[in-house]
Amino acid sequence: GRLWVVQYTQYPDPAGLKRLSRDKVWRVSYEKLPPPPPHIKGSPYRGTDKITIHEDTNNDGVYDKHKVFVDGLNMATSVAHDAKGVWVTNPPYLIYYKDENSDDIPDGNPEVHLTGFGLEDSHSIANSLVVGADGWIYGAQGSTVSASIIENLSKDKGPPIVSMGQNIWRYNPHRNKYEIFAEGGGNAFGVELDSKGRIYSGHNGGDTRGFHYVKGSYYQKNW
């Protein structure tokens, strides 16, 4: 068996903070949108998050082979593998590393498919990618972050798709189409599909431990 792991280290330098200018009084300006990876060593945007692969080569139940697929990420929260590469939520981005020969080495820099996942609260950022049998990529958005999503590769790019958190979203990579699948569910972390394609998510909402999401539905929110 093979295990893909995202190692998420708390973002040490929110949104790539840096001083841009000064005059008679100090004036600090903050970049609201860090650039997408890759980030060279020494870059203020380079993080310590990484995606690793662990393999049990002799089927004894112990992972004996370990490999880093990509490192230097910042706030990488989930990974999903398809036939030709690897999807990663690295807010504010959804990125895709092609690996068409399946050698566990990225074929190049990632494609940035979506931009605009909120960074207001690192405990609630976009997370939990899973590839559905319908070809859509599903993910969750927690309780205290917004989103203003731009479909970077769409030929019919319209205005940003805005949401205020607490939802399950999905993305069709063949049509470059993003949409809100269902709203509500609190601080959602974790997305699962059962054998019939039904979608579930867990959260930290007291006595309620999770929701079954139906397309287009609107569930309880905690604000």
Predicted regions and their residues:
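Beta-propeller blade termini and top-face loops
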Residues: G1-W223
